[in-house]
Structures are given as structure tokens and as C-alpha cells.
């Protein structure tokens, strides 16, 4: 399995390297969502446009890593009992366990203007500050309380820790720390920005979704059997507060809307939820 991952990543990396001299061009025959996803490194062909956007994924994602009931069960013990314990570490690791294919997992993708940072390390710090501020603004706009957990040890991805936030919102069933936000930012790389990325510059510090393990993500999880938190609204609010050059991709069954998981993929850009819908039908 490790060898297969390495081979697949090498093939994808080679494809990306071939495009390094010029940024990816916009494909008028694809939706904006698909153009942004492809630019962000989601190249596998399980993801594609469909006439109405609800049949844009080729495979069933009813697997353990993305099964919301399974994920919720793993978080049943409230965080107030887990802080600093191996169980919290297990829960954080569980959130990280997603499929190899980029289209099958939630991902953050970004093209931070190179003028905003002096180095890749500086760019990482800037990304973290942007995401933290977006979570804070989104929480305030929805009148919920989100607290960043700084006293817990979490797994690292690409040399950087997984960030955890505890959410309190009694009207949505978030009490006793049973709701969390988890995100991570991989080490940004120098890249070229596609012209259709809003607010971008020609050169950027990029976080992409193509690596089998070292990719960025932001997910909300609510434990228990009743998924009452408006995750779709929260993701939209976070996206609206993020810089315009960051987009959020979610695979089927990972976004909760009206208490039910959406069975199709979506991408959030500037607060808008984009579907993978053929341009002729948009």
C-alpha cells in the first residue's frame, strides 16, 4: 500500500511539475468548482461535473473513514474527559484518517500572494492566522462559542500540528465539548497562481490537495447520533471570512445540511457553496 501511494503521488507530482512553468488554464467546459479543484491538486477522475451537480462522484463513500456515524461514535466521550489523554490523541488521529484519493476527502487549498510572506515558514504562520481569524469571525456571526485548545498534544502533518477548537452552542446540541473543529495547514510551497483565483498574484505560497498524506483540511465534527449543528452554514461562514484565495473542498457525505449529509461533493469559495455542475446546466 505504501509503495502504491508513493507511485501515485510520484505520477501526480510529475504532472504538476509539467505545469509549473505556466499556471493551469481555465477550462470553459468545466464548472468553476471543478476548475478550482483541479488547480488545487484534485486530479483523480472520480470527481467530475454532472448535469445537476448531485451525481459528480463516481464511487460510493460509505466507507469507515468518511462514515459520519463512525466518526461521531469515536468522539462520543466529551473532550472535557479527554484533554491531555491518549483518547483525545486517538480522536485527533481518527479525524486525520481519510482516503488516499484527493477527491474522497475534505481539503483546504490556497494560493497566498507571495508578497504577504518572506518565506515558506512565514507563509505557514500567515495561513494559520487567516484560518484562526475566519473561525473566530464565523463563530461570532453564528452566535456560537469556539475556543482554540492550546493545552493538548495532537498529531503532526508535514511537521505541523493538527489544530483543535472546542465549540459550545446549546441550541445546536453542542455542550460538554462534544463538538470540535479540527484543521491543519501543510508546509506551503512556492507556486504559480491561476488567473481565475480571486485576489491572487502571479506567484504564491500554495497549499494543495494532491499529496496522499501531507494536505490541509478543516472539518467540523459533532459526536452523538443527532447531527443538529448546521455544518453547511458554518462552512459557508468560515469561507466568507477566509481570504479570497483560499477554497474549501468537501467530498460526499462530509457536509451536514438540515441534519442530513449531502451525498455529493461541494466547494466553498468566498462564502458561496459551489456544485460540480456542467456549465451548460449552471
Give names to the regions the model predicted.
Residues 1-21:
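Sec-dependent bacterial lipoprotein signal peptides
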Residues 5-7, 24, 39-41, 45:
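Short non-domain terminal segments
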Residues 7-8, 16, 27, 74, ...:
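Generic hydrophobic secondary-structure signal
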Residues 11-14, 36-37, 60, 80:
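Compositionally biased, low-complexity repeat tracts
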Residues 18-38:
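Bacterial Sec signal peptide processing site at the extreme N-terminus
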Residues 38-77, 87, 91-282:
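Mature extracytoplasmic/lumenal regions of exported proteins
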Residues 82-86:
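Compositionally biased, intrinsically disordered low-complexity regions enriched for acidic
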Amino acid at each position: 500500500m505504501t509503495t502504491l501511494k508513493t507511485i501515485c503521488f510520484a505520477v501526480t507530482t510529475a504532472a504538476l511539475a509539467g505545469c509549473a512553468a505556466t499556471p493551469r488554464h481555465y477550462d470553459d467546459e468545466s464548472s468553476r468548482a471543478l476548475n478550482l479543484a483541479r488547480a488545487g491538486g484534485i486530479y483523480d477522475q472520480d470527481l467530475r461535473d454532472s448535469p445537476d451537480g448531485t451525481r459528480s462522484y463516481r464511487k460510493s463513500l460509505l466507507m469507515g473513514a468518511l462514515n459520519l456515524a463512525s466518526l461521531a461514535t469515536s468522539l462520543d466521550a466529551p473532550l472535557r474527559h479527554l484533554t491531555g489523554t491518549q483518547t483525545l490523541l486517538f480522536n485527533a488521529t481518527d479525524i486525520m484518517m481519510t482516503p488516499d484519493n484527493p477527491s474522497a476527502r475534505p481539503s483546504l487549498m490556497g494560493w497566498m500572494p507571495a508578497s504577504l510572506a518572506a518565506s515558506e515558514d512565514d507563509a505557514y504562520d500567515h495561513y494559520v492566522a487567516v484560518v484562526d481569524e475566519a473561525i473566530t469571525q464565523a463563530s461570532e456571526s453564528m452566535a456560537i462559542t469556539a475556543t482554540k485548545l492550546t493545552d493538548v498534544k495532537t498529531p503532526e502533518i508535514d511537521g505541523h500540528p493538527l489544530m483543535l477548537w472546542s465549540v459550545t452552542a446549546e441550541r445546536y446540541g453542542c455542550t460538554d465539548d462534544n463538538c470540535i473543529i479540527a484543521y491543519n495547514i501543510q508546509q506551503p510551497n512556492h507556486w504559480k497562481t491561476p488567473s481565475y483565483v480571486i485576489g491572487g498574484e502571479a506567484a504564491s505560497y500554495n497549499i494543495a490537495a494532491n499529496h496522499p498524506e501531507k494536505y490541509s483540511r478543516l472539518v467540523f465534527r459533532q459526536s452523538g447520533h443527532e447531527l443538529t449543528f448546521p455544518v453547511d452554514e458554518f462552512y459557508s461562514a468560515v469561507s466568507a471570512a477566509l481570504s479570497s484565495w483560499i477554497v474549501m473542498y468537501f467530498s460526499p457525505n462530509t457536509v451536514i445540511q438540515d441534519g442530513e449529509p449531502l451525498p455529493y461533493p461541494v466547494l466553498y469559495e468566498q462564502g458561496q457553496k459551489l456544485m460540480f455542475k456542467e456549465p451548460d446546466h449552471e
